[in-house]
C-alpha cells in the first residue's frame, strides 16, 4: 500500500534530489486583491517569497524514476504543456482505473478480469513518473510556483484515497473494516509528513519511502495479481493460518505506517525544541485527524445498519475528502507561515453530527442518507477550496493555472 511520507516531495516547486530550490520571489501587485477566501493579507506576502526545501534519498527515484521523467520532459512533452496539466493527467489515469475497477468489483470483493489489475498497475506507474515529470517541466519552463506545489499536493492526497479503494478491491478486502484500514494507513503517513513539514520547514525523504518504494510495492502487487489472479489474497497465510494473506498485508502496512508516523512526530518535536519552543504542543495539530480516524472507525464497527457493507467506497471517499482538505489547509498554513486552524467548518459539522449519532444522542434515521449527505458536504467543500484557492494563488502570483508563463 502507499506508505507515502509526502507527495509534496514530488511537487513542481522543487527537485526531489538533495537540494533546495529558491523560487524567484514574485513582485508584489500594485493593487492587492481583497476578499480572498483562503489567503490572508499577511499570507500574500509569504506566498510571494515562499521557498520550498526538500530532498529524496531513494535509490529507486534517483536511478530510475527521475531519469525516466527527465527523458519524458526532454523528448516527449511539449514545452507549451503546463505542469499542472501533467498533474491532472496523471491523476486522471488512476481515477479512470478506479472507475473501471468499480464497475467490475463494486463491493471490493468480486473478481475482475485480469486486465483490470494490469491496467491499475500501469496507471499507478505512469502516475508516479508523471508526478515527477510535472516538477521537471515546471523547472524547465521556469514555471515553478507555490501554486504548483499545492496543486500537486492536493492531487497526491486524492490519489491516496482513490488508490486505496482500487487496492482494496485488488486484494479482495470487501466491505469490511480491513478496507478502511488500508486507506487510513497511507492517509496517516501523508498527514503526519505534512504536519512534520509544517513544523520543520523542510521534507527529507529517506532511502526507502512511500512516493517511490511504496508505489513500487503497489503496482507490483497489481501486476502479480493480474498474472496469478486475486483469489490468492483470500487464502490462509502460511505463517499465520488464522489470517488470510490480504489481512496479513494490511497488518504489515498499518504497522509500517504507525512507525513512520512516530518518526515524523519525533522529528517535528525535536525541531520545535531546537527552536526553544514546546515540542509537545505541536501534537495539538494532529487532534482533528485523530478524531476523524476514531469516529470513522467507530462508525464502521458499530453502524446500526452496517452501512459500510452497502456503501464501502462512499464512506472512504467521504472520509478521504475531509482528510485531503485537512492536508491542503496545513500546507497552505505552512506556505503562508500562519497558525494551522484546527476547527474548520466542514470538519466540525461532520464531527459533531457523527459524535451525536455514535453516542446515541440523536437517532440514526436512514443511515445511508447520512453518509450520502456527508459525501455531498465533503465534496462541495473540497471543490470550493480547490477552485477558489487555485484562482487566488494564480492572481497573487500573476500566473495562469493551466498555461505556461512565457519569459
Features from the language model and the residues they span:
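Membrane-embedded alpha-helical segments that form the functional core of polytopic membrane enzymes
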Residues: 88-149, 163-164, 178-189, 249-253
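Alpha-helical transmembrane segments of multi-pass membrane proteins
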Residues: 90-94, 156, 349-353
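Juxtamembrane "helix exit" motif at the C-terminal ends of alpha-helical transmembrane segments
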Residues: 93-109, 168, 223-229, 355-362
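Histidine/cysteine- and/or acidic
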Residues: 121, 137-211, 219
